[in-house]
Regions:
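Generic N-terminal targeting/processing segments that precede catalytic cores or assembly contacts
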Residues: 1-388
């Protein structure tokens, strides 16, 4: 059965909902682990005032009993505490009080095109759903996908490798142990010196009323070879990873392995040579492909990078047009963050976890998690899989 993850809710509405459907029964979930993932999404130097209001916690309203999944859809809810300050403006039902419409779309946001597409006169009807606040629901759902993957021996991590012009040294030798303390960095960067430079860059540009983008990297370890397929374009795992990560607000580019870098080197330097011995089975000494060849996982660590643009909500707004009068105006001023690349990495983990969980469900099925494990073990035996 295919796995689905659906979210609902607006940024300043009563709350956010996530429905995850397609996971087997018998999977153990830890409430504290789910809440830790939500807390991680709120990390990062450069966050705005809303993080002082929201202390995200997940409430499970379906699909789980006594800490185990039932095989039915899993319903997760995250309350928006800030709704108390927006109750009249964001009420689902008509209110007596007058609420002013927003007519000033922000360049780089969904505001203008959203009002055109859906025939709306109030930009808030677009921006509330388009907001990255929606990713809290994705992280809640992704945390369940992570639990499923962990039950099958797969772990997913992320770290920040660039903020504007500050880039951390490249590391190709990372292991799961290297990520144990990544969240201790205020920008979730593994390099101490790069962390200091990134923090300084955020502080410098924030004083200039600027926002900052950057690049985060997601790595998955313990992934079995053969997830995805070469036979149909829509089953190619690299395509599915790209779509999932590009769906995150403000993400503009995705690369797998060496990505765009291979366009500038000859073929002998672009691919991973294949070797074999009795102890290791098939193996590669390099991982330029990032764990994906021909639309399928190779069994090497999955390495995916996503590039995030600076946030379009600026404290010094860009030029825009009032959609009610068509007169020139400054774009909407809205409470915002300066830099959310560290948090976006956590969202990236959730989306990669969802894609991998769906791939495992598609390939190994199972009504109960034990059925899935048995199918996975049989597959590993058939292909002579050795852990890497």
């Amino acid at each position: 059965m295919a796995l689905t993850l659906t979210t609902a809710g607006e940024s300043h509405g009563p709350g956010l909902t996530c429905i995850v459907e397609g996971l087997p029964a018998g999977l153990e979930l830890d409430r504290d682990a789910l809440n830790r993932e939500l807390a991680r999404r709120q990390l990062g130097h450069g966050r705005g005032g809303r993080m002082k209001i929201e202390k995200d916690q997940v409430t499970v309203t379906g699909g789980v009993r006594h800490g185990r999944t039932l095989g039915s859809p899993i319903a997760l809810q995250v309350v928006n505490r800030d709704y108390a300050n927006w109750e009249e403006r964001m009420s689902p039902w008509p209110v007596d009080a007058a609420t002013a419409e927003v007519h000033l779309p922000r360049p780089g946001h969904a505001d203008l095109v959203g009002t055109q597409k859906y025939g709306l006169t109030d930009v808030r009807d677009v921006l509330e759903r388009a907001s990255a606040r929606e990713t809290a629901a994705r992280v809640a759902g992704g945390s369940v996908c992570k639990a499923y993957l962990q039950a099958l021996g797969v772990t997913v991590f992320s770290h920040v490798i660039q903020i504007t012009g500050v880039t951390a040294p490249r590391r190709d030798d990372l292991t799961p142990e290297d990520f144990e303390h990544v969240d201790d960095s205020p920008v979730r960067c593994l390099d101490v010196e790069a962390t200091k430079a990134m923090v300084a860059e955020i502080d410098r540009l924030r004083k200039q009323n600027e926002s900052l983008g950057g690049v985060f990297e997601v790595r998955a370890f313990g992934v079995v070879p053969g997830l995805g397929s070469h036979v149909s374009w829509e089953e190619r795992l690299d395509g599915r990873l790209g779509q999932a990560l590009l769906s995150i607000q403000a993400i503009k580019a995705v690369s797998i392995g060496d990505g765009a870098e291979v366009a500038g080197v000859p073929g002998s330097q672009a691919h991973d040579e294949i070797f074999f011995d009795e102890q290791r089975g098939y193996y590669r000494e390099t991982n330029r492909a990032g764990g994906v060849e021909g639309g399928m996982t190779t069994g090497d660590p999955l390495v995916v990078r996503a590039s995030m643009k600076p946030l379009p909500t600026l404290t010094k707004p860009l030029r825009s047009v009032d959609i009610a009068t068509h007169e020139p105006a400054e774009a909407l001023r809205e409470r915002t963050d300066s830099c959310t690349v560290p948090a976006a990495g956590v969202v990236g983990e959730a989306m990669v976890a969802f894609v991998l969980a769906d791939a495992y469900r598609t390939k190994f099925g199972g009504d109960h998690i034990d059925d899935t494990r048995a199918a996975l073990d049989a597959y590993k035996l058939r292909i002579g899989y050795r852990p890497r």
